[in-house]
Regions:
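Membrane-helix interface segments
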Residues: 42-44, 95
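Short alpha-helical hairpin
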Residues: 1-9, 52-58
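Active-site-proximal substrate-binding core of FAD-dependent oxidoreductases
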Residues: 93-100, 112
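Short helix-capping and hinge/turn segments at secondary-structure transitions, especially at repeat
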Residues: 36, 59-63, 83-91, 108
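Divalent metal-dependent phosphate-bond-processing catalytic cores, especially two-metal-ion Mg2+/Mn2+ enzymes
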Residues: 2, 13-41, 54, 91, ...
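An active-site-proximal "capping" alpha-helix that borders the catalytic cofactor pocket
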Residues: 27-30, 72-88
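His-Asp-centered metal-binding catalytic motifs of divalent-metal-dependent phosphohydrolases/nucleases
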Residues: 45-64, 78, 100-107, 124
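Active-site metal-coordination segments of metallo-dependent hydrolases
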Residues: 15-26, 64-77
Length: 175
């Protein structure tokens, strides 16, 4: 299955919602970069990329059912929607199962199992730490420095993810 078909399907799913499209596109970009630099196998990278494109697929049904996009609701609602989409697009059963597992856990930060899971969480954090910041007056955002430092200490485990976080948010010891 071609990941670009999934990318296009996700754009269509969130048509008229550029914020959501921008978000999953950025998460995918960081996930792919980290995955490649951390030398994931082609199979692991493929699953990671599919999960990065679909990780927030549960937002739409969560908002429709509960009026909320809370992380736990995304984890609850996302796998079923993703499973249907991935099956329709012809993804292999083992890929679908792992992607759905990752979607169903991507806001759970304890007991992270697997490099794909760790990297997906790091990529999502890189984007969310910026997007959840306060407006900076120039059309961008000013991230909460304490939140960045806490996430760096508690969440980031890969060398590449740590390096991107330090570089992006000007944490001490950037190298």
């Amino acid at each position: 299955m071609n990941l670009n078909q999934l990318f296009c399907e996700r754009i269509q799913y969130y048509r008229n919602d550029p914020k959501r499209i921008q978000h999953f596109t950025k998460v995918h970009s960081y996930a792919k970069l980290i995955g490649e630099r951390e030398q994931l196998s082609p199979e692991e990278l493929y699953i990671l990329e599919a999960a990065a494109y679909t990780h927030d697929i549960g937002i739409k049904p969560a908002e429709e059912k509960y009026g909320s996009s809370a992380g736990k609701l995304q984890e609850q609602e996302g796998p079923a929607v993703a499973r249907g989409m991935l099956m329709r697009l012809g993804f292999a059963k083992d890929v679908i199962e792992r992607v759905c597992y990752l979607i169903g856990h991507h806001h759970t930060y304890t007991g992270i199992e697997g490099r794909d899971y760790q990297i997906l969480v790091e990529a999502d954090f890189l984007v969310n730490l910026y997007e959840d910041g306060r407006p900076d007056g120039d059309g961008g955002f000013m991230p909460d420095k304490a939140a960045v430092e806490t996430a760096y200490q508690r969440i980031f485990a890969t060398e590449t993810g740590k390096w991107i976080c330090r570089s992006m948010f000007a944490l001490g010891g950037v190298s």
